[in-house]
Amino acid sequence: MAETTKIFESHLVKQALKDSVLKLNPVYMIKNPIMFVVEVGMLLALGLTIYPDLFHQESVSRLYVFSIFIILLLTLVFANFSEALAEGRGKAQANALRQTQTEMKARRIKQDGSYEMIDASDLKKGDIVRVETGEQIPNDGKVIKGLATVDESAITGESAPVIKESGGDFDNVIGGTSVASDWLEVEITSEPGHSFLDKMIGLVEGATRKKTPNEIALFTLLMTLTIIFLVVILTMYPLAKFLNFNLSIAMLIALAVCLIPTTIGGLLSAIGIAGMDRVTQFNILAKSGRSVETCGDVNVLILDKTGTITYGNRMADAFIPVKSSSFERLVKAAYESSIADDTPEGRSIVKLAYKQHIDLLQEVGEYIPFTAETRMSGVKFTTREVYKGAPNSMVKRVKEAGGHIPVDLDALVKGVSKKGGTPLVVLEDNEILGVIYLKDVIKDGLVERFRELREMGIETVMCTGDNELTAATIAKEAGVDRFVAECKPEDKINVIREEQAKGHIVAMTGDGTNDAPALAEANVGLAMNSGTMSAKEAANLIDLDSNPTKLMEVVLIGKQLLMTRGSLTTFSIANDIAKYFAILPAMFMAAMPAMNHLNIMHLHSPESAVLSALIFNALIIVLLIPIAMKGVKFKGASTQTILMKNMLVYGLGGMIVPFIGIKLIDLIIQLFV
């Protein structure tokens, strides 16, 4: 699922070519009125090729009319090819998912406690099944008994198994995943054909994809332009009669196709499908295309601190000795107290100790694990003891043993806390040696990412349960714009509503049942696949890898989708305007000599001008397919900067490219005339 599919893989291209021909069916083509106009023109050109006197006009060269027919046919095939290729990529992903839905048996538990083996497809909602090591979970369900590790790699692409148990936030299992160890009893929660995987396949294939509001608005604009250009073309016929100029039906057909926005009309559907495809490449399930587009309008991101901005594991950052001890002695004691500590904090202390270039000898001793009661861990050697733990617990231990508390210890502990860190006090026997500074580490690359989002006009808000001082320290280090300290789940809803009241589009992440109301309230809610079912139902995006930082990726994909559609629309309309001024002077120059002043391209003849424009019109669709599929590339910048850049590249470029392309094609046509 997480693998990236190349745009022009041979098997996808072959299937897309077949599908692009099948899509020529008028019943299908009428769904895209712009391209349907092209198909009507193609059929009229075919009719004029077979019956030159079809409209009782002066006969026109059959070769010329047939050339128009072929070019229009290729235009339709190319437009259909872009859509078929985008759909093919989705189907390829769906097939990969469908491979996990192999025929399997289920061990259903009967009311008397005995088992019966049945086909998984016969399971109904409410049935209870037992799944043991190496077996696949037959359908979506809820763990009601047992504890096991479950391999979800077939669905999420994540190789590390996850622990599932009854109760809490980790009792939901997905059909098609397998039990890696132990056993589970699962209550089926979905009917056959309506599982999470079935819905995922349907969404990836685009079967339930509907046009988004932005697509509908753009489509309305394109249809309006199409009608306007068709009216212009129809008025040309009586104008030509008045000027005693022979304007054939074939030329009118070709001219109409050249001027209506066929480029974006042929690529519009592919852009939308490809946008959904890019989201699935990140292992994110979008419930609708609208949710992806909404991401493009997001201007406020609400992010949890733990797991999203920070790694969530406190890491050793510094050793700070008290005045009565030495740095070397503190490092050795911290190392000894942590060498058998397999927690992330313990491993980070050992790693930091190695970096101090001090001789660290390992003695044999009895490891004392951390408990909630003692709040410390350490090692008992034959002649001494070494511990590390919470300041209060360590001070209490020393006092009870009649030891001495260093006068500067309190200042060291408070200093670490003010920086947003967690202090651990280290002692040897009953002597306090110093403090280990544990720091909640900011994830790599986030500072740059937040800067990029800020340049794009997106505000980041960090929500954390930490106190004001700790929250301020981490917010400053990470580079977020604002923070909400001592934030409870219900406070997130208030933050979302406040931002929405200002007219902002808000996105947030969550995974627990208590996050569900906020996920539903936000304009874009990204739920973790490892989270509760209520969170996943409330959200409109689900991250199969359960990585909260992906919300930023989805926002960028949404912006890229909107930019791609806008850029190619600008390019297409600019193309149409350029073709208008490139073709008309060449066509009417004989009847209206004054038009010669506008004939800056000096095309060979009216016929070659029309054919050149038609060929360019068809080829430009093919050339723009990679951009439609991959999206317009952009770097973090303000909306105004991006708009100006795209207007320059796709607006001005859309005006210049047709003049160059049509002239080159005209020169090639002259070689064969």
Swiss-Prot record:
Keyword Transmembrane set for record: yes
Q: Where are the transmembrane segments?
A: 34-54, 65-85, 216-236, 253-273, 581-601, 609-629, 649-669
Xref: InterPro entries: ATPase_P-typ_cyto_dom_N, ATPase_P-typ_P_site, ATPase_P-typ_TM_dom_sf, ATPase_P-typ_transduc_dom_A_sf, HAD-like_sf, HAD_sf, P-type_ATPase_bsu_IA, P_typ_ATPase
Task: Tell me which UniProt keywords the record has, alphabetically.
Answer: ATP-binding, Cell membrane, Ion transport, Magnesium, Membrane, Metal-binding, Nucleotide-binding, Phosphoprotein, Potassium, Potassium transport, Translocase, Transmembrane, Transmembrane helix, Transport
Q: Which residues bind Mg(2+)?
A: D511, D515
Example of a GO cellular component annotation carried by this entry: plasma membrane
List residues binding ATP: D341, E345, F370, T371, A372, E373, T374, R375, M376, S377, K388
E.C. number(s) listed in UniProt: 7.2.2.6
Protein's membrane topology: Multi-pass membrane protein
Query: Which GO terms of the molecular function aspect are on file?
Result: ATP binding; ATP hydrolysis activity; magnesium ion binding; P-type potassium transmembrane transporter activity
Primary location: membrane
Q: Where in the cell is it found?
A: Cell membrane
* Entry keyword annotation includes DNA-binding: no
Q: Where is the active site?
A: D304
> Which PROSITE patterns does this UniProt record tie to the protein?
ATPASE_E1_E2
List the catalysed reactions.
Answer: K(+)(out) + ATP + H2O = K(+)(in) + ADP + phosphate + H(+)
Give a single Pfam family match: E1-E2_ATPase
The protein's matches in Gene3D superfamilies, at most eight in alphabetical order, are given as:
Calcium-transporting ATPase, cytoplasmic domain N (3.40.1110.10), Calcium-transporting ATPase, cytoplasmic transduction domain A (2.70.150.10), HAD superfamily/HAD-like (3.40.50.1000)
Q: Which HAMAP family match?
A: KdpB (MF_00285)
Its family? Belongs to the cation transport ATPase (P-type) (TC 3.A.3) family. Type IA subfamily.
Subunit structure, interactors included: The system is composed of three essential subunits: KdpA, KdpB and KdpC.
* Role of this protein: Part of the high-affinity ATP-driven potassium transport (or Kdp) system, which catalyzes the hydrolysis of ATP coupled with the electrogenic transport of potassium into the cytoplasm. This subunit is responsible for energy coupling to the transport system and for the release of the potassium ions to the cytoplasm.
Q: What is this protein called?
A: Potassium-transporting ATPase ATP-binding subunit
The organism's lineage is: Bacteria, Bacillati, Bacillota, Bacilli, Bacillales
Q: Which gene encodes it?
A: kdpB
